């Protein structure tokens, strides 16, 4: 298992064209309660669990639109051990057996934004054999939708990797709300598209490009702890979120027509690679007024922004927070130093 980070509508109006389902679930056929009886063997529906305890993964009753859904509870602190993952095996085999020409993997799902008090980033990711490819989820600290993407860095290929993406939408979403999200990755062209509540955006990042050629190997539902700012304490209680009605497909069609897709990059900020061992890149067209790094205790560490890079070689391995101020406001992201 590759761990590089720690509306019932299926977007039928957004995802068009011929497609074949590779993996899906609506959880309605499962027994309420624990997803599995073990952290080491697959449970209901072939779901595997990673991190935490059996009780952290539950099938719960929903409403008329969502009869049952998967609820995941994160840990009670801000460390990586509070992260949670749910995954099935079989995506790599299904992708390898797809119909010839169906080189676009795309997914849609509903996320329940969950806990309002503690902080979490919860959603889904598609992983390849060695790295993350694409992901999208809800950030409870900013109440916004954040993306993930593997990017090739124009100025320094050694910094290629899995990046955190903010600025996908200016909309915010409160706690305990269902939001419909989607994504696509084109193996042939490398194009990545995100869909938030029916609105599509093709990813374009200043100083970087998406990468073609990756084969999807695993679909992960995941949650990781975050903090609202560097002065906030780490999570002092559990965090929750939910997932329902997900569909992962292989298709030969792009998401919408090119005239219907928003191609806006002025608000996009990509931070990574995450994890990193030497440099943290900040890729954006926005003017960066300030960049500061803090450890998880809230202590500021020495760092200097040089162009669009921060040298982190001197940092001890572990989790850190980067606090950015741009002309569009503040961005707080967590990253891991290897």
Residue ranges and their predicted role:
Residues 34-75:
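Extracellular glycan-recognition surfaces and repeat-rich motifs
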Residues 154-179:
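Short, aromatic/His-centered strand-loop micro-motif at the edge of beta-sheets
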Residues 262-338:
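C-terminal outer-membrane/trafficking sorting elements
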Residues 69-151:
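Secretory/extracellular carbohydrate-interaction modules
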Residues 1-23, 258-261, 274, 319, ...:
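Bacterial Sec-dependent N-terminal signal peptides
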Residues 27, 109, 180-207:
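Carbohydrate-binding surfaces in secreted/extracellular proteins
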Residues 27, 241-248:
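Extracellular beta-strand elements of beta-rich domains used
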């Amino acid at each position: 298992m590759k761990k590089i980070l720690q509306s019932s509508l299926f977007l039928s109006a957004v995802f068009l064209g011929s497609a074949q389902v590779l993996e899906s679930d609506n959880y309605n056929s499962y027994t309420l309660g624990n997803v599995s009886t073990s952290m080491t063997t697959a449970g209901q529906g072939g779901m595997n669990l990673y991190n935490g305890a059996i009780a952290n993964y539950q099938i719960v009753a929903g409403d008329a639109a969502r009869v049952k859904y998967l609820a995941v509870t994160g840990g009670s602190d801000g460390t990586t051990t509070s992260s949670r993952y749910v995954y099935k095996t079989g995506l790599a085999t299904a992708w390898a057996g797809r119909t010839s020409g169906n080189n676009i993997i795309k997914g849609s799902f509903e996320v329940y934004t969950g806990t309002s008090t503690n902080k979490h980033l919860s959603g889904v990711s598609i992983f390849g054999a060695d790295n993350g490819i694409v992901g999208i989820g809800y950030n409870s600290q900013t109440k916004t939708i954040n993306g993930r993407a593997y990017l090739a860095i124009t100025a320094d290929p050694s910094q290629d990797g899995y990046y955190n993406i903010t600025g996908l939408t200016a909309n915010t979403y409160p706690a305990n709300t269902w939001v419909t999200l989607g994504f696509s990755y084109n193996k042939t062209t490398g194009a990545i598209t995100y869909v938030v509540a029916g609105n599509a955006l093709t990813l374009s990042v200043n100083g970087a490009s998406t990468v073609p050629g990756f084969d999807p190997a695993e679909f992960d539902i995941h949650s990781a702890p975050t903090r609202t700012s560097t002065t906030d304490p780490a999570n002092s209680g559990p965090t929750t979120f939910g997932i329902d009605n997900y569909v992962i497909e292989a298709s030969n069609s792009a998401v919408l027509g090119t005239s219907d897709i928003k191609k806006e990059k002025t608000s996009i900020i990509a931070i990574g690679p995450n994890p990193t061992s030497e440099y943290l890149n900040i890729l954006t067209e926005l003017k960066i007024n300030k960049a500061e790094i803090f450890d998880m205790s809230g202590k500021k560490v020495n760092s200097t922004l040089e162009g669009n890079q921060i040298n982190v070689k001197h940092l001890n391995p572990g989790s850190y927070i980067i606090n950015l101020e741009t002309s569009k406001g503040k961005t707080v992201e967590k990253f891991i130093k290897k």
